[in-house]
């Protein structure tokens, strides 16, 4: 288990008393991110894990869906539809880098839609302020997920509902 953002910031002091740079706070955030994606049980446990590490007005931006703003929207408009579609979704951090208070995280997502397994890669750019994410922009190709959905007709209603909800949501 990783420390909370407050603990990570409290502990962000070198042994000589000098404050640590932003990279250490970002490293704590990335460790939490890796833990959160490694073995989520469901949408709620996933969101509960991330909640203390997200700004109240966090912006989540990615292709194919409208931006998601706020913790509640993260839960209801991002995580819940995603885990409804891919109940066994999990991810592995393959690498990361930081520039100041921005992390670039390479994430390999794996799961099953219907009976179709898929693997999808993304690079998330996460802006971190005071130990919490204020914005996440995902660079991804959703083709592997879409192919799994297309090959699993029983998943179509769930997928279509999530897409329609996204279209109805204001930008």
Residue ranges and their predicted role:
Residues 47-101:
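A solvent-exposed, acidic/Ser-Thr-rich amphipathic alpha-helical stretch
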């Amino acid at each position: 288990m990783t420390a909370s953002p407050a603990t990570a910031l409290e502990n962000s002091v070198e042994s000589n008393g000098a404050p640590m740079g932003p990279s250490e706070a970002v490293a704590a955030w990335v460790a939490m991110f890796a833990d959160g994606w490694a073995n989520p049980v469901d949408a709620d446990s996933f969101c509960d894990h991330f909640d203390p590490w997200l700004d109240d007005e966090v912006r989540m931006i990615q292709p194919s869906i409208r931006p998601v703003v706020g913790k509640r929207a993260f839960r209801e408009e991002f995580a819940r539809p995603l885990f409804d579609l891919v109940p066994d979704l999990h991810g592995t951090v393959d690498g990361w880098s930081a520039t100041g208070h921005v992390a670039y995280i390479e994430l390999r997502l794996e799961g099953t839609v219907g009976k179709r397994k898929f693997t999808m890669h993304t690079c998330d750019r996460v802006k971190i302020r005071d130990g919490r994410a204020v914005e996440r922009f995902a660079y991804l190709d959703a083709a592997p997920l879409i192919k799994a959905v297309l090959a699993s007709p029983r998943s179509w209603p769930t997928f279509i509902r999530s897409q329609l909800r996204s279209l109805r949501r204001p930008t």
